[in-house]
């Protein structure tokens, strides 16, 4: 069985060497979809009986690990010295230094890397993170797959 939940956040970024407007500082209303697979929990006394995982727990983990960290932040590539220097001069600015250029593809892969260890097989139901889908716009997204 697979389950999917969706969370949204706002963040800024830039693609430093991009040939078009994406090289400029700009932002998006991102959506993050998390797909997990596992057996339906059969333990009758468990609050999660009949579920793969409680959606509220799926969302809480994603919020704490990724969404709250990235929401209303500027995601900047660690080697984008010009923008990093600028952001470091802004008092109390929420900056996330990214290991790679923060494209939709790299953001999806980074979210997958972060979340993979967060979703534990607590009930022995073979819980597994299958996919992280990151929407940069309503019509454009990237999938990071198991």
Question: Where are the language model's segments positioned?
Answer:
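Charge-rich, low-complexity N-terminal segments
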Residues: 1-146
């Amino acid at each position: 069985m697979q389950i999917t939940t969706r969370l949204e956040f706002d963040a800024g970024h830039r693609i430093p060497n991009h040939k078009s407007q994406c090289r400029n500082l700009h932002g998006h209303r991102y959506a993050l979809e998390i797909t997990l697979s596992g057996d339906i929990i059969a333990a009758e006394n468990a609050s999660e009986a009949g579920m793969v995982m409680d959606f509220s727990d799926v969302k809480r983990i994603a919020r704490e690990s990724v969404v709250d960290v990235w929401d209303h932040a500027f995601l900047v590539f660690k080697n984008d010295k010009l923008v990093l220097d600028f952001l470091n001069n802004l008092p109390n600015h929420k900056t996330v230094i990214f290991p790679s250029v923060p494209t939709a593809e790299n953001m999806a892969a980074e979210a997958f890397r972060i979340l993979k260890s967060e979703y534990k097989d607590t009930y022995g139901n073979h819980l597994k993170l299958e996919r992280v889908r990151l929407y940069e716009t309503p019509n454009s997204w990237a999938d990071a797959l198991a």
